[in-house]
Design a protein with these regions (language model features):
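Conserved active-site and cofactor/substrate-binding residues in soluble primary-metabolism enzymes
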Residues: 35, 43, 56, 60, ...
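Rossmann-like NAD(P)H-binding beta-loop-alpha module
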Residues: 91-95, 99-165
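Generic secondary-structure signature for well-ordered alpha-helical cores
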Residues: 6, 10, 89-97, 114-122, ...
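C-terminal catalytic/substrate-binding lobe primarily of soluble NAD(P)-dependent oxidoreductases
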Residues: 145-223
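Rossmann-fold NAD(P)-binding glycine/threonine-rich loop
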Residues: 52-68, 75-104, 114-115
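N-terminal glycine-/serine-/threonine-rich beta1-alpha1-beta2 phosphate-ribose binding loop
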Residues: 1-64
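Glycine-enriched alpha-helix->loop->beta-strand junction motifs that scaffold or abut catalytic
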Residues: 44-45, 69-71
Length: 223
């Protein structure tokens, strides 16, 4: 944590697992950090950003913060597709906001869907482009060399290549838009920016889709 603050030129941070010490630092505007995520709900902050990507940790931290009447913004789609509706209700019950952050595919795609609907267009398909090769039998060991070359955690890269991340994000998009998945596992064809409208046309028009109003993804020069 200290190194992160130093790299950003923010000086020295107070690192502690003592709530009173952290709250004192917060009160004086001093950067503060902790190794115990489960005390965050006790800190004197208005908004908590949960970005672990770990469903269990995210669920515990987020629910505790909502119960403490703190707004929570998440970059944890893995948690959101699991218990997002429950957390949304908890937030409403406590008069605070629970929201998925802008920046990742589900929310950005949702914004485009809402824009199209505002203009009274029918949404045939919404989704994302996948810029990693689809290797469903990947393991952290098989992608380790590539991951280290990219300064990534092999487990994280594996979740990209084996399709886990894409499937999770598209479930989130389906949940929030009301669109259905095109089929179990989705089609995931190769495409490009110039050919997207042809690839995701209905089958009767030469595309892959058997019906409109679905979520899917593609690979290729689109991301």
């Amino acid at each position: 944590i200290q190194q992160a603050y130093a790299d950003l030129g923010l000086g020295t941070a107070v690192i502690s697992d003592d709530v009173s010490v952290l709250n004192e630092a917060i009160a004086t505007g001093t950067p503060a950090g902790t190794t115990n995520a489960f005390i965050v709900s006790q800190l004197n902050v208005d908004v908590v950003i949960e970005a672990t990507g770990v469903p269990e940790v995210g669920a515990r931290v987020t629910s505790a913060c909502l119960n403490a009447k703190k707004h929570v913004a998440v970059l944890n789609v893995e948690m959101d597709v699991t218990i997002g509706p429950l957390l949304t209700k908890m937030a409403a019950d406590h008069g605070v906001i629970y929201a998925v952050c802008h920046g990742d595919e589900p929310v950005e795609a949702l914004a485009l869907v809402e824009f199209a609907r505002d203009l009274s267009f029918e949404v045939i398909m919404a989704g994302k482009g996948k810029n990693n090769p689809f290797e469903p039998f990947s393991t952290p060991d098989t992608v380790r060399e590539r991951a280290l070359a990219k300064h990534m955690n092999p487990k994280m890269l594996c979740s990209f290549t084996d399709g886990t991340k894409t499937m999770t994000e598209m479930v989130a998009l389906a949940n929030t838009t009301g669109l259905e998945l095109s089929k179990r596992g989705m089609y995931g064809p190769a495409s490009s920016v110039k050919t997207l409208q042809d690839t995701f046309a209905l089958q009767k028009d030469g595309g892959v889709l058997d019906r409109p109003g679905v979520v899917d993804y593609c690979t290729g020069d689109v991301a």
